[in-house]
C-alpha cells in the first residue's frame, strides 16, 4: 500500500505543503508544477515533480509507475486552456503518447477528478492561489494497492485540521 499526497501551484509558499507532509505522512509526494522554489527543496520534499509555466527548473513531463499503475505528470500549460472541457481532452491526448493510467496536472488552480478515455485525471487545485468557487485551497490524496488506485479524495485545506 502506497499513500500518496498530490499538490500543485504552491507558488513559492511552502508552509502548507510542509504541514500536509507532516500531517498525512505520505509515502510519495507529487507536485504538479508552479512550485517556484529551488531544486534542493523540491528534491527534499517531493518524490515526483515537474516545472510549471512559472518555474525555471524541472522537467515538463514525468512518467513513472507506482505499483502497477502508469502515471503521467505534467503541469497543464502544454495545452491551451480556453475551455476547461476541451483542455482536459487535449491533456488526455498528450498523456496518451505514453503508457498512462493516471494523468496528474495543475495549472488551472481548480480541483478536478474524472475519467476520460479510461485515464483517471487528477488536478489537486492550488494550495496557495485557489480559483475554485469558494476560493478554498485544495490538494489530493489517494492510495495505490498494486494495480488499483483507491481512496481518491480532494481535500480542502484548513489550518486547524493540520496543525
Swiss-Prot record:
Mn(2+) 2 binds at residues 34, 53, 75, 107. Mn(2+) 1 binds at residues 9, 11, 34, 109. GO terms for molecular function: hydrolase activity; metal ion binding. Its EC number is 3.1.4.-. Keywords: Hydrolase, Manganese, Metal-binding. InterPro entries: Calcineurin-like_PHP_lpxH, Metallo-depent_PP-like, PdiEstase_YfcE_CS, Phosphodiesterase_MJ0936/Vps29. NCBIfam families: yfcE. Belongs to the metallophosphoesterase superfamily. YfcE family. This is Probable metallophosphoesterase MG207. It comes from Mycoplasma genitalium (strain ATCC 33530 / DSM 19775 / NCTC 10195 / G37) (Mycoplasmoides genitalium).
Amino acid at each position: 500500500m502506497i499513500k500518496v499526497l498530490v499538490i500543485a501551484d504552491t507558488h513559492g509558499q511552502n508552509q502548507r505543503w510542509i504541514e500536509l507532509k507532516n500531517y498525512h505522512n505520505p509515502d510519495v509526494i507529487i507536485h504538479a508544477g508552479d512550485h517556484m522554489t529551488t531544486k534542493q527543496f523540491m528534491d527534499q520534499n517531493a518524490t515526483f515533480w515537474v516545472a510549471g509555466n512559472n518555474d525555471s527548473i524541472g522537467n515538463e513531463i514525468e512518467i513513472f509507475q507506482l505499483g502497477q499503475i502508469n502515471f503521467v505528470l505534467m503541469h497543464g500549460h502544454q495545452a491551451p486552456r480556453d475551455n476547461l472541457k476541451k483542455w482536459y481532452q487535449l491533456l488526455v491526448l498528450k498523456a496518451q503518447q505514453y503508457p498512462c493510467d493516471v494523468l496528474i496536472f495543475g495549472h488551472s488552480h481548480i480541483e478536478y477528478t474524472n475519467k476520460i478515455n479510461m485515464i483517471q485525471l487528477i488536478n489537486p487545485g492550488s494550495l496557495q492561489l485557489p480559483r475554485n468557487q469558494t476560493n478554498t485551497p485544495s490538494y489530493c490524496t489517494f492510495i495505490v494497492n498494486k494495480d488499483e488506485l483507491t481512496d481518491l479524495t480532494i481535500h480542502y485545506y484548513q489550518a486547524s485540521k493540520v496543525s
